[in-house]
From Swiss-Prot:
It comes from Ruminococcus albus (strain ATCC 27210 / DSM 20455 / JCM 14654 / NCDO 2250 / 7). Keywords: ATP synthesis, Cell membrane, CF(1), Hydrogen ion transport, Ion transport, Membrane, Transport. This is ATP synthase epsilon chain. NCBIfam families: ATP_synt_epsi. One of its GO terms (cellular component) is proton-transporting ATP synthase complex. It is a peripheral membrane protein. Its main location: membrane. PANTHER family: ATP SYNTHASE DELTA/EPSILON CHAIN, ATP SYNTHASE EPSILON CHAIN, CHLOROPLASTIC. It holds the Pfam family ATP-synt_DE_N. InterPro entries: ATP_F1_dsu/esu_C_sf, ATP_synth_F1_dsu/esu, ATP_synth_F1_dsu/esu_N, ATP_synth_F1_esu_C, ATPsynth_dsu/esu_N. GO terms for molecular function: ATP binding; proton-transporting ATP synthase activity, rotational mechanism. Belongs to the ATPase epsilon chain family. F-type ATPases have 2 components, CF(1) - the catalytic core - and CF(0) - the membrane proton channel. CF(1) has five subunits: alpha(3), beta(3), gamma(1), delta(1), epsilon(1). CF(0) has three main subunits: a, b and c. The keyword Membrane applies.
Length: 134
Protein backbone atom coordinates (compact mmCIF):
# COMPACT_ATOMS: atom_id res chain seq x y z
CA UNK A 1 0.00 0.00 0.00
CA UNK A 2 1.25 3.51 -0.82
CA UNK A 3 2.44 5.68 2.06
CA UNK A 4 2.31 9.37 2.94
CA UNK A 5 4.09 11.45 5.56
CA UNK A 6 2.11 11.91 8.77
CA UNK A 7 2.83 14.15 11.74
CA UNK A 8 0.69 14.16 14.87
CA UNK A 9 1.60 17.02 17.20
CA UNK A 10 0.55 18.21 20.66
CA UNK A 11 1.81 21.32 22.44
CA UNK A 12 4.20 19.11 24.42
CA UNK A 13 5.52 16.61 21.89
CA UNK A 14 5.61 14.99 18.51
CA UNK A 15 3.26 12.05 19.07
CA UNK A 16 3.84 10.38 15.69
CA UNK A 17 6.05 11.25 12.76
CA UNK A 18 6.64 8.90 9.89
CA UNK A 19 5.15 7.00 7.00
CA UNK A 20 1.50 5.97 7.20
CA UNK A 21 -0.69 4.00 4.84
CA UNK A 22 -3.99 5.32 6.17
CA UNK A 23 -5.40 7.69 8.78
CA UNK A 24 -8.96 7.42 10.07
CA UNK A 25 -10.28 10.30 12.18
CA UNK A 26 -13.69 11.58 13.26
CA UNK A 27 -14.36 15.15 12.18
CA UNK A 28 -17.29 17.45 12.86
CA UNK A 29 -18.90 16.12 9.66
CA UNK A 30 -18.18 12.42 10.23
CA UNK A 31 -15.33 9.99 9.76
CA UNK A 32 -12.65 10.65 7.17
CA UNK A 33 -10.18 8.15 5.77
CA UNK A 34 -6.99 9.58 4.34
CA UNK A 35 -4.76 7.72 1.89
CA UNK A 36 -1.80 8.81 -0.23
CA UNK A 37 -2.92 11.30 -2.86
CA UNK A 38 -5.84 12.68 -0.84
CA UNK A 39 -6.97 16.09 -2.04
CA UNK A 40 -5.92 19.10 0.05
CA UNK A 41 -8.20 19.18 3.07
CA UNK A 42 -8.69 20.79 6.47
CA UNK A 43 -11.18 19.68 9.13
CA UNK A 44 -11.83 19.86 12.86
CA UNK A 45 -11.40 16.60 14.78
CA UNK A 46 -13.72 15.76 17.66
CA UNK A 47 -12.79 13.62 20.68
CA UNK A 48 -12.77 10.08 19.33
CA UNK A 49 -10.68 7.10 18.39
CA UNK A 50 -8.12 7.88 15.69
CA UNK A 51 -6.50 5.02 13.77
CA UNK A 52 -3.14 5.06 12.02
CA UNK A 53 -2.25 2.26 9.62
CA UNK A 54 1.49 1.80 9.34
CA UNK A 55 3.49 -1.28 8.30
CA UNK A 56 0.26 -3.08 7.41
CA UNK A 57 -1.46 -2.83 10.79
CA UNK A 58 -3.65 -0.31 12.57
CA UNK A 59 -2.86 1.32 15.89
CA UNK A 60 -5.56 3.21 17.80
CA UNK A 61 -5.29 6.36 19.88
CA UNK A 62 -7.70 8.46 21.92
CA UNK A 63 -7.60 12.00 20.55
CA UNK A 64 -9.05 15.21 21.96
CA UNK A 65 -10.25 18.10 19.83
CA UNK A 66 -7.91 18.93 17.00
CA UNK A 67 -7.35 19.76 13.36
CA UNK A 68 -6.31 17.56 10.45
CA UNK A 69 -4.70 19.13 7.39
CA UNK A 70 -3.72 17.47 4.12
CA UNK A 71 -1.40 19.71 2.13
CA UNK A 72 -0.88 19.71 -1.64
CA UNK A 73 2.28 17.61 -1.28
CA UNK A 74 0.23 14.92 0.56
CA UNK A 75 1.83 15.74 3.91
CA UNK A 76 -0.79 15.11 6.61
CA UNK A 77 -0.60 17.02 9.88
CA UNK A 78 -2.79 16.50 12.93
CA UNK A 79 -2.69 19.13 15.68
CA UNK A 80 -4.35 18.28 18.99
CA UNK A 81 -4.25 19.27 22.63
CA UNK A 82 -3.99 15.64 23.79
CA UNK A 83 -3.61 12.16 22.34
CA UNK A 84 -2.48 8.79 23.66
CA UNK A 85 -2.16 5.28 22.31
CA UNK A 86 -4.98 2.98 23.42
CA UNK A 87 -2.58 0.59 25.15
CA UNK A 88 -1.06 3.43 27.20
CA UNK A 89 -4.32 4.81 28.64
CA UNK A 90 -4.57 4.67 32.43
CA UNK A 91 -8.21 3.58 32.69
CA UNK A 92 -8.39 4.07 36.47
CA UNK A 93 -7.21 7.67 36.05
CA UNK A 94 -9.72 8.21 33.24
CA UNK A 95 -12.51 6.83 35.47
CA UNK A 96 -11.52 9.28 38.24
CA UNK A 97 -11.50 12.15 35.74
CA UNK A 98 -14.95 11.10 34.53
CA UNK A 99 -16.31 11.05 38.09
CA UNK A 100 -14.84 14.52 38.83
CA UNK A 101 -16.34 15.95 35.64
CA UNK A 102 -19.76 14.44 36.37
CA UNK A 103 -19.67 15.90 39.88
CA UNK A 104 -18.70 19.33 38.49
CA UNK A 105 -21.56 19.19 35.96
CA UNK A 106 -24.06 18.63 38.79
CA UNK A 107 -22.72 21.56 40.83
CA UNK A 108 -23.95 25.09 40.33
CA UNK A 109 -21.12 26.61 38.33
CA UNK A 110 -20.50 29.34 35.81
CA UNK A 111 -21.06 28.66 32.12
CA UNK A 112 -17.28 28.55 31.59
CA UNK A 113 -16.78 25.98 34.35
CA UNK A 114 -19.71 23.93 33.01
CA UNK A 115 -18.23 23.94 29.48
CA UNK A 116 -14.83 22.90 30.83
CA UNK A 117 -16.35 20.05 32.86
CA UNK A 118 -18.33 18.94 29.81
CA UNK A 119 -15.14 18.80 27.69
CA UNK A 120 -13.34 16.90 30.46
CA UNK A 121 -16.20 14.40 30.63
CA UNK A 122 -16.14 13.83 26.86
CA UNK A 123 -12.38 13.32 26.94
CA UNK A 124 -12.58 10.85 29.86
CA UNK A 125 -15.40 8.85 28.27
CA UNK A 126 -13.48 8.74 24.98
CA UNK A 127 -10.29 7.54 26.71
CA UNK A 128 -12.20 4.78 28.52
CA UNK A 129 -13.97 3.72 25.32
CA UNK A 130 -10.78 3.58 23.25
CA UNK A 131 -8.87 1.74 25.99
CA UNK A 132 -11.61 -0.89 26.24
CA UNK A 133 -11.40 -1.64 22.48
CA UNK A 134 -7.92 -3.14 22.86
Amino acid sequence: MAVFKLRVLTPEKIFFEGDAEQLIAKTTSGYVGILKGHAPYVASIVPSEMKIRSDGSFRSAAISDGIVKVSEDSMVTVLTSAIEWSDEIDVARAERSKARAEKQLKAETSRTEFDLAERQLKRAVNRISVANKK
